[in-house]
Amino acid sequence: MEGWQRAFVIHARPYSETSLLLDFFTENEGRVRILSKGARGRRSPLKGALQPFTPLLIRWSGRGEIKTLRDAEPISLALPLTGTVLYSGLYLNELLSRVLENGTSYSTLFFEYLSCLQILAASETTPEAALRRFELALLTQLGYGLDFLHCAGSGEPVSDTMTYRYREEKGFIASLVVDHYSFTGLELKSLAKREFPTAGTLKAAKRFTRMALKPYLGGKPLKSRELFRQFAIKKCAKKSVLIEDK
């Protein structure tokens, strides 16, 4: 690969004493695993650039599964993700690192990812709707072609007030059962449009994407969720101390 590509670091781990093994999400090649030799060294010019949420231009070489980084240049400063939105960004990166196939193009998803990061960077609290839209875009890119607008049993258009139960690999079937797997027709229409005007439709979207992504993620828990839980616990504890001091 001789040309430059836009990319983001989505995962990194030490490799030997001075190098890094990186997963990049690239504009044209999707997820690519690349070895950056000497990137951990004190004098490496790449040390500050190879960070999450920094838009990059990169070049690499190699024919095997693990490529070798040749050049990397920041396009701009890192997108400023702090506080709770930082953990949302880490969640996006972990999703991509775990579910995308190596070397498969997801060019549309690359721009969905960039857009979501920009929304996160402009927010003080996590914009849940942006995360749900990204998850739905990811499912579409993975080939998850689910019809939200028709009953999988009858083929008829969904009705706003009726209840439909989700069945994996089949779709939504009209049902009188109301449980974790049930959605109203109105909620399904919101999922189809990727628009969530109410708290109820937003909660339904989160419930659905959790279920739909589970087969891709397997049984291994997401580290980003655990990190966010620890952050939230510490934040609550700090608030309690401040209240007691007043």
From Swiss-Prot:
Keywords linked to the UniProt accession: DNA damage, DNA recombination, DNA repair
GO cellular component, as recorded: bacterial nucleoid
Coiled-coil annotated spans: none
Entry annotated with the keyword DNA repair: yes
Gene3D superfamilies recorded: Nucleic acid-binding proteins, Recombination protein O, C-terminal domain
GO biological process, one term: double-strand break repair
InterPro entries to which the protein is assigned, alphabetical: ARFGAP/RecO, DNA_rep/recomb_RecO_N, NA-bd_OB-fold, RecO, RecO_C
Pfam family, one: RecO_C
Recorded superkingdom: Bacteria
Family assignment from sequence similarity: Belongs to the RecO family.
Function noted in UniProt: Involved in DNA repair and RecF pathway recombination.
Name of the featured protein: DNA repair protein RecO
Biological source species: Proteus mirabilis (strain HI4320)
Origin organism lineage: Bacteria, Pseudomonadati, Pseudomonadota, Gammaproteobacteria, Enterobacterales
Gene: recO
